[in-house]
UniProtKB/Swiss-Prot annotation:
Name of the featured protein: Bifunctional glutamine synthetase adenylyltransferase/adenylyl-removing enzyme
Homology family: Belongs to the GlnE family.
InterPro entries linked: GlnE, GlnE_rpt_dom, NT_sf, PII_UdlTrfase/GS_AdlTrfase
GO biological process: regulation of glutamine family amino acid metabolic process
One GO term describing the cellular component: cytosol
Presence of the UniProt keyword Transferase in the record: yes
Amino acid sequence: MTDASDLLSLSYSHYLARAAAARPALAERIAAWAAAPVTRAALDARLDELLAQGGQPPSEDALKKALRQLRGEAFGAVAERDLAGRADVAEVTGTMTDLAEAAIQRALALLAAELEAQYGEPRGPSGERLALGVVGMGKLGGRELNVSSDIDLIFVYEDDGETAGGARAPISVHEFFTRLGRRLIGVLSEATADGYVFRVDMRLRPNGDSGPLVCSLGMLEEYFYVQGREWERYAWIKGRLVTERASAAARRLAQQLDAIVKPFVYRRYLDFGVIGAIRSLHEQIRQEARRRATMRPDKADDIKLGRGGIREIEFSAQVFQLIRGGQDAGFRVQPTLAVLRHASASGLITEEVRAGLTHAYLFLRTLEHRLQYRNDAQTHAMPVDPAERAALAASLGFADYAALIDRLDQHRAFVEAQFDQVFADKADGGARREDDQAAGCIWSGALADDGADEALVARLAELGFADPAAVLARLQAVWRSSRYAGLPESSRVRFDRVAHRALEAAPGIDAAHRDETVVRCFDLLETVGRRGAYLALLTEYPAALRRVLSVLGATRWGGGYLIRHPQLLDELLDDEAIDSPFDWPAFKDALRRRLAAADGAEHQMDLLRHAHQAEVFRILLLDLAGRLSVEHVSDRLSELADAMLDVTIEVVWSQLAKRHRDTPCFAAIAYGKLGGKELGYASDLDLIFLYDDPDERAADVYTTFARRLITWLTTATGAGTLFDIDLRLRPNGEAGLLVTDLDAFRRYQLREGDAANTAWVWEHQALTRARYSAGDARIGAAFEAIRVQVLTTPRDAAVLAKEIVEMREKVLAGHPNTTERFDLKHDRGGMVDIEFAVQYWVLLHAARHPEMIRNTGNIALLREVSRFGLMSEEEAETVGAAYRTYRKLQHRLRLDGMEKARVEPERVAAERQAVAALWARVFGA
């Protein structure tokens, strides 16, 4: 144990030196406390000792004295451990937070008991006991309390009511808790001969100093809804109940408070509007700091409010919480460093930035404590007195003050740069080009003036539009629409800024797509106009608007997808996420965590859709950048579908009331494009559901489960649909059971049942492209064994060829083409001819060449066929190239929004001829 005469804290802190002189036992107490970290249990035990000295029950004066003595001892202990290098920032702030919570909870318990003796216990409308909740805001809420800090508090209670009555007549619950709150403030903050415990600031409550001291949850909710401002959302991020949580009244209050605060602070959508709000708040704080510096030059160098200071780190962290906390529960934490860790883990900042901000934060908080230990003053100003400067530098281990300032400036420069990267106003500055001036004249009140049409058409022509009159008509429709007219002023300002930028960008857009790109951009703006956060994103990040225009110009389908799902705008900001490798296990784990934190089934369904849409959009961006081949696009989309099915099966099963086991013996089997890993952006999923469970309830349970699963996959929520599902390939098609027992599926496919309940040849054709997709992998392996057995069954060539040709004719008849254009998929000489030929070879020859049943795609199977001498290598390459060409054209046409993949016949004349020759050779027709 440190000897009391050697205490660093007494030699450094003038406040502690004075306190020890007035209370001789303090030095020994500090020395004893400083031997180990000060725990909450130790604080409570010491408070018990101090209160016992004042008699039982302790009076209010005895309570004040005990709390002030405890505060002096705890302050000295953390100062000693900190100055000796034995306590880090987390220990110092944690101890001070524990002290505040212990003081609040003990004071409330004693004061409430006194008031209840007079007025009776506070009760709600149904007679239930009520409790006063004390919400710690700011650094208290974040468990980051500094050593000489105010505590920001808000008092809340569950509901209005009346006390039960005691020595005096009953009073309203509101009056009871108001009296309790006033007395609590006095106990904590009143300056006595023993000092104070904590200065209390109540200005963050609804309506500030003009509002009631305590408020019911109903009043708080109404205030949030009607008057809540952006800075209050920021403040409530740190809000945390610091009163006891053990009683039923306290637990009820905590649950209801969380239900009110969470949707106010954390919006369901990505909220980029907070960037401007925080920028404005920061500027107000800076102006106040500059005003104070003018009045007190000795306080000018402020490490909290100045550039690169503590507040800028807090803002840099909390902007992620406000923007993303509604969708990512990992951001709903209070400590600043925890937020930075999650931002780094989520790929929103680099590990280098996280480390730099963390080191700066810890340095600044340590420096802050050194400044405050000196005189127990709530100061953040660097000293001007040479002796004070020297003492400060020495306490931090620097040779002199200049070395300290050099390190401080390095940290502040890093913080300032990171803050500006997020919050700097990115509005274009400088002189406006002629194009800019033209855009400004176009998107203006002139759009409401029919007499200005000719001039506006001329302006649009100057910007390079091919059909300026049509573009003008669209702009006028938007300008005159009720949607635009009804926008709040702040949203309209943002809308106008983005509209100007979109028109200014027109000359740089590919001329072939310029008109439709800008028109689609205004379609998007109309869609997001009432969601100010998206307008804020496009305003704050001009690069995002450039990418939007790029997507809208490159693909009609992608443009429509973005307009339907505007939350995807956020994906345009994150180059690192776009470029990161596809890691489906990590994707599923992250999605599971978000689902576990979601507020109910509806929110979970939305989260599934948002996660899927974000990955589809990422694939699209890579596709448009030419960084994925058509085959790789299909691979990624198919892998994504597998992942989504797997997670959805888990979450739906977990909520099934009838489930009889923890994990379902159930699997989704993929057919068609998903089975062959040739999925497109808008493809249906061809699925069948299998189960293998001996439980007598299994058929009923899995049928119910399958229905629920289909609902989760296909229902249109506010976030859209997840997938369109086609289950017609299940045994007996639409007449069959929704989910099939594995053994029944085996007998059906192997034709071991009665003739009316056995698979057709076309079902075996479909089986060539089938595979396990999601769910129970054991069932997946059993399915693959059945598939192998079916496909390797010997078959008669003539009978098989006849049935496949007949099925080909049915497919052709089912997709009539009355145009002169060639249907890449269904017309003769197209993709279906290649697929049927490959399936014929697999079914006919897999008994001798089982390698052919591998589900590797049609092009790879053509090579396998040639390897076994069933076609020449040259023919395999020619037909494979034709299939690849068809897929590329189909892919491009789908991106262009074409429902039917049809082209001019001469564009693929060589490919059609090669495929027709193949068909004639194989089937003789």
